[in-house]
């Protein structure tokens, strides 16, 4: 049994190796897990190594190899042709959104997050709205920091396993690594896309061949958070 942080680090290393062929640096791992120092990463890596999930490769820099993944690991469907970080997914009926005005912890170890409106997975729509209701989200899907929920509208991210009507869990922030799926504000419009840093430009990539990649200057794109999880509810 892995702790939440051990699981998060293992999946981050696994996805980064799939994306680039190289394990992430200690600085990247520290930032991804919101840890204050690299010593915490060293402890997590040692624990994963002792449990047989990863191993260090001798005589190579940044040399970590994922040996196995926990059986309960669940990720969204991979983007075809583009290995990348994929969020945790909770599928099922779920709990209905509530209209509670204040954040609170539910009895089943979940946190009620604000649903701030709809986000376009397609052509950008108007910028994020004000809170309309709240959705219980399991604590296991969340780390440190402030989070919010958006309802997906459109089909441009279907090859990343993100479907029309899904609820995406967003960690609030104004920075993201290349390859991460983000909420991007372009002018007065918000969209959910994979961010790529290409020299001095920012590319917003869809995960659907019907949609073109859009290129912007760095001052034209405002990151408002990055995707960390997804809830799919069946009615």
Swiss-Prot record:
It comes from the Bacteria. One of its GO terms (biological process) is DNA repair. Residues 26-46 bind DNA. Its EC number is 3.4.21.88. Keywords: Autocatalytic cleavage, DNA damage, DNA repair, DNA replication, DNA-binding, Hydrolase, Repressor, SOS response, Transcription, Transcription regulation. Residues 72-104 are annotated as: Disordered. Coiled coil: none annotated. It holds the Pfam family Peptidase_S24. It catalyses: Hydrolysis of Ala-|-Gly bond in repressor LexA. The active site is at residues 156, 193. The record marks 121-122 as: Cleavage. SUPFAM superfamilies: LexA/Signal peptidase, Winged helix' DNA-binding domain. One of its GO terms (molecular function) is serine-type endopeptidase activity. Represses a number of genes involved in the response to DNA damage (SOS response), including recA and lexA. In the presence of single-stranded DNA, RecA interacts with LexA causing an autocatalytic cleavage which disrupts the DNA-binding part of LexA, leading to derepression of the SOS regulon and eventually DNA repair. Homodimer. Belongs to the peptidase S24 family. This is LexA repressor. It comes from Caulobacter sp. (strain K31). The lineage of its organism: Bacteria, Pseudomonadati, Pseudomonadota, Alphaproteobacteria, Caulobacterales. The gene is lexA.
